[in-house]
Amino acid sequence: MGFFNNNPVIEFFHRITRKPSTIAMWVFAGLICSSTFYLMFMSSPTIDFNSKSKKKNDK
């Protein structure tokens, strides 16, 4: 029984089962922050090489 007394891991999972909305909030916030970080720093700018948008006489 000493394993379950004052164990932070057991207490963490007990807290999750009592308030699942808290975990959903952190997952949603993490998703927003990680996607913003990815779009700002990790993605390269795209260049449109669409030849249809250019005129035939352009060089």
UniProtKB/Swiss-Prot annotation:
One of its GO terms (cellular component) is peroxisome. This is Uncharacterized protein YBL039W-B. It comes from Saccharomyces cerevisiae (strain ATCC 204508 / S288c).
